[in-house]
Amino acid sequence: MGLRVKENGKSEGHPVMGWIGVASADNIILRESEQTSVWSFLTRKLGKQIQEAKQMTANTFAGAASHTEVNWRTINWSTVHQNVRRLQARIVKATQEGKWGKVKALQHLLTHSFSGKALAVRRVTENQGKNTAGVDKETWDTPDKKAEAIQTLKQRGYHPQPLRRVYIPKSNGRLRPLGIPALSCRAMQALYLLALNPIAETTGDRNSYGFRPERSTADAIEQCFNVLSHSYSAPWTLEGDIKACFDGISHEWLEAHIPMDKTMLHKWLKAGYIDKHIFHQTEEGTPQGGPITPPAMLQTLRIFFRR
């Protein structure tokens, strides 16, 4: 980890860092041992009754049954957003109360709902990378393709495709590797992002601004001014760079600490990538380019700086 210490004074025009370590919030470190076993116990004992109850609740939040034909043009997006936000609010509340078994159950409900799947497909087909294809060269550029994508976005039997490796220039003249997932994998990651973000935002450091929804560079600049403009402010700022942060992180550590479906996360981490028509396995690191990577790294940095 390289560090530079600079005396506070005139601005040198550097971009604001994505991580401003001024003061850590009272965050919660998620541990498997902290998760209640109530949900798994009920699932084992009540089996069919629990599954029926989950399905009834899922249908309430879904807005449409996942097995029926979907017409992209007639989807009520206001209802979809409302359903997703309602479940996310429940995840936030359960996180604040430390009810990790309930968090897990609500995440499952959201990632298997029609509203969650529809919103995930919409987000990956309307963002700036909507026309950027993965290794399968497939894009969802028509309403019919988008509707079909919702119906085929299923966890059972899901196997992620390898990433398409591309390189973009960095400010220092070097190249930054990016892994471009196929649209089907991007949509699946966007779906699980809906269930992970409420936890990441609830437990995240209040002074972290990079890769955060509803936060911008202007917000980071304002916080820097608020912290450094007083006579009693710290006379020094510390800038650090974690070398190859994305490339060298342990898969086992991520699977143990990121509060999401472990099986799905494992599949993404081990998907590999194709570079110049050659397949490469991934034994460590998380690719830059997928929707799930930023919140996963924010959770990693939160725990790192807390310790």
Protein language model regions, located:
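Amphipathic alpha-helical blocks
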Residues: 141-160
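Short, motif-level signal for alpha-helix interfacial/capping segments enriched in acidic residues
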Residues: 75-77, 111-115, 212-226
